[in-house]
């Protein structure tokens, strides 16, 4: 009897503890985007989160055995988030029959390795094509028509003009999100990308019968209403096309935008956007995580049809913003040398910067671009592609960059959107020419003159300058944190009424959010008090207090 009573009491206690613990998981807030000043932040577990990620190669997450062997490499790269795809063909091998084995295993492995996930939905389109559609979609081309080129030839691209395709993609995506809602009370998945690099090839638009019929219809009222309401802020490309036809409030596509290939791209972009909007809405209705789209960029000098056309490119932002208002933002995939130029285009009042594919992992400029993106453009996250590609990261710049950015995360997240932080990176042209000239920026009553070489480094190669970058955060009236690699910062009075000196300069690190002071830097290490100089051989942090004198 005594043992029985003890057992009953223990059982009752266990039930009480279980019931008390259950709401904790259930009450863990959903990841969300939240405005702070002039930007938006990703909120995870109720707190701002700086996403330091890496995107897996396309097929790495399709096998749990393969994926399980990748985590040590990912952890050595310094990530806090992995970006990984889930495939329609693997999730729904038979229509209406779903297999979440790989997804569940991915979640479990990420938790075991203390990582968050950004999930990529490889559905109807991945890099323009439809190779991730299930076999039952691929084979049934009458139910799921293909896009056609100008010559009428079918392409291996599902047409966005098919309501049946939209219904099938929505059903699968919503099923994934419903499963996540049930399986991920820990909020391991913090965001979801809807499709991947949508765009039309090899022509500017779909020339199939469904598309041709849509082209003859009136331009939808929500699009013309958006153009009218945002006329002064429209991108020059869209505004020029619209105003060239008289800035009409209604009419056919030809009447409102003309008949050029540029006008055809607008037409195709609208239908991609509205398809994506409906798909995103279905996913959010099932489980309301932040959702975004990404885009492959167009090369200079290429016309629509000569690049993956009609995706959410900067010159088409207005079409996508009007057609896909449920999508939270547009992310940038960039593999061109002119990173600084492209990244600036994606930071807008209505679009926080997120870089899911920041060129290939292992490149020497990855770290410098991360500091620029986060410091200057308030990026919510940064992620090189093919993070599981390098054999090791022992000699790579990424772990050092992410280590410093992790230490600075509380300061960065506090400063975002408030005008308390600047970032620096030497711009590079598309042809690869590095602009080595010093840069100036205003911050907290000071003018910052930033160079990418010390005065005695006269013969630096452009390739050496390209891998240098950093950020500056104001932490007090005359106090700043300078972090990065190879940058030299001279502080001047913004009004020019006083001279500025370095009162105290130290190197150090943040441990559990508290500054741990290292060497006091003076003499040669500050050029006798003239400037703050970050080491050229790795990413570091320095803290400086300034004084003014006359």
Please provide the spans of the model-predicted regions:
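Aromatic-lined substrate-binding rim segments of carbohydrate-active enzymes
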Residues: 66-141, 272-286
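N-terminal carbohydrate-binding accessory modules
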Residues: 26-80
């Amino acid at each position: 009897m005594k043992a029985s009573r003890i057992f009953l009491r223990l059982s009752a206690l266990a039930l009480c503890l279980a019931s008390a613990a259950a709401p904790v998981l259930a009450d863990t807030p959903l990841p969300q985007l939240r405005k702070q000043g002039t930007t938006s932040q990703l909120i995870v577990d109720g707190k701002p989160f700086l996403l330091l990620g890496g995107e897996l190669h396309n097929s790495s997450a399709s096998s749990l055995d393969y994926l399980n062997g990748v985590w040590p490499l990912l952890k050595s790269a310094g990530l806090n988030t992995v970006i990984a795809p889930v495939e329609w063909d693997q999730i729904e091998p038979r229509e209406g029959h779903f297999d979440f084995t790989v997804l569940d295993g991915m979640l479990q492995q990420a938790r075991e390795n203390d990582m968050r996930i950004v999930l990529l939905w490889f559905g109807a389109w991945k890099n323009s094509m439809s190779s991730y559609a299930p076999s039952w979609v691929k084979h049934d081309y009458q139910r799921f028509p293909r896009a056609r080129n100008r010559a009428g030839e079918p392409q291996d691209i599902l047409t966005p003009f098919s309501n049946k395709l939209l219904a099938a993609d929505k059903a699968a995506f919503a099923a994934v999100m419903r499963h996540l809602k049930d399986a991920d009370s820990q909020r391991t998945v913090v965001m979801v990308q809807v499709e991947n690099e949508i765009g039309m090839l090899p022509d500017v638009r779909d020339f199939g019968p469904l598309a041709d019929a849509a082209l003859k219809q009136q331009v939808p009222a929500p699009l013309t209403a958006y153009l009218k309401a945002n006329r002064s802020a429209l991108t020059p490309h869209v505004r020029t096309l619209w105003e060239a036809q008289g800035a009409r409030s209604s009419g056919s596509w030809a009447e409102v935008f003309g008949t050029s290939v540029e006008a055809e791209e607008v037409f195709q972009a609208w239908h991609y956007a509205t398809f994506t909007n409906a798909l995103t809405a279905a996913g959010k209705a099932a489980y309301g995580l932040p959702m975004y789209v990404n885009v492959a960029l167009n090369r200079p000098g290429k016309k629509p049809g000569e690049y993956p056309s009609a995706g959410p490119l900067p010159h088409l932002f207005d079409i996508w913003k009007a057609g896909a208002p449920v999508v939270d933002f547009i992310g940038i995939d960039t593999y061109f040398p002119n990173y600084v130029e492209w990244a600036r285009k994606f930071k807008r009042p209505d679009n926080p910067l997120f870089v899911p594919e920041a060129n290939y992992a292992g490149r020497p400029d990855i770290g410098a671009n991360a500091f620029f993106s986060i410091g200057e453009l308030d990026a919510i996250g940064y992620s090189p592609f093919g993070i599981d590609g390098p054999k090791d990261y022992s000699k790579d710049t990424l772990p050092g960059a992410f280590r410093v950015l992790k230490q600075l995360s509380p300061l960065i997240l506090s400063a975002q959107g408030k005008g308390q932080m600047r970032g620096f990176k030497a711009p590079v042209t598309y042809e690869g020419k590095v602009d080595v000239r010093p840069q100036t920026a205003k911050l907290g009553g000071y003018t910052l003159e930033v160079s990418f070489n010390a005065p005695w480094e006269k013969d630096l190669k452009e390739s050496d300058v390209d891998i240098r970058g950093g950020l500056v955060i104001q932490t007090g009236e005359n106090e700043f944190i300078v972090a990065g690699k190879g940058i030299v910062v001279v502080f001047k009075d913004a009004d020019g009424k006083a001279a500025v000196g370095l009162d105290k300069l130290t190197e150090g690190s943040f441990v559990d959010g508290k500054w741990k002071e290292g060497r006091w830097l003076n003499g040669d290490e500050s050029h006798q008090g003239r400037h703050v100089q970050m080491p050229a051989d790795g990413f570091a942090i320095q803290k400086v207090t300034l004084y003014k004198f006359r």
